[in-house]
Design a protein with these regions (language model features):
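Flexible phosphate-sensing "switch/lid" loops adjacent to ATP/NTP-binding sites
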Residues: 18, 30, 37, 47-84, ...
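A glycine- and Lys/Arg-enriched "phosphate-lid" helix/loop adjacent to the NTP-binding pocket
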Residues: 70-144
Length: 191
């Protein structure tokens, strides 16, 4: 939110509370993983349609790439989505990304599992309280693999364990400047 306000970009946020499967998913991942991921993918397509129709620049807090490359893949690797269902999901994903233009920049906020657990606790969403530490560790591993192989657009990686964009003005100012510099193609190297 703060980043979009400072940059004057229109924000598009992940519709967490809209997913009718999410609470069921966190209580029984095996039964609801495919349904939940398919919902997120179709919802993300709707958001991308809005992004394409929006005037000016936008900020999106979760991309279609993350849905498929991290969350759905993690569930498949944990045998929570069957190979048949995962194949259908991947077919749909590949069609979608072929039709969508890539973003101008991906900002990756790198965080440890401890930081993620702390942030989840501070949000106070009851359905997130039971997320296993191991699940977050698996997601983190897949995020690192994905971001290191992502080539569709420039990537800005920001370590965020000690980052506080809400309470520390210097942090938000620095991140805004980094984003503006990357979008404008400006890079300064200090040797």
């Amino acid at each position: 939110q703060l980043l979009s306000e400072r940059l004057g970009f229109q924000p598009f946020f992940e519709p967490v509370n809209d997913n009718p499967y999410l609470e069921d998913f966190y209580s029984d991942m095996r039964s609801w993983a495919f349904h939940s991921q398919l919902y997120f993918l179709t919802r993300r397509l709707r958001i991308h349609k809005q992004l394409l129709e929006a005037e000016g620049s936008v900020v999106q807090d979760r991309s279609v790439y993350e849905d498929a490359e991290i969350f759905a893949r993690n569930l498949y690797l944990q045998n929570l989505i069957s190979p048949r269902d995962y194949g259908v999901y991947q077919d749909l994903y590949q069609i979608l990304i072929a039709l969508l233009p890539p973003p101008n920049l991906v900002v990756y906020l790198r965080a440890s599992v401890d930081t993620l657990l702390s942030r989840i606790a501070s949000r106070g969403r009851g359905f997130e309280a039971s997320i296993p530490r191991e699940y977050l560790a698996s997601l983190n591993t897949l995020y690192e693999e994905w971001i290191n192989s992502f080539t569709q657009c420039p990537v800005l990686i920001i370590p965020s364990d000690n980052l506080n964009l809400v309470a520390r003005e210097a942090h938000i100012a620095q991140v805004v400047q980094l984003v503006q510099d990357r979008l404008m193609g400006k890079t300064e190297v200090t040797l």
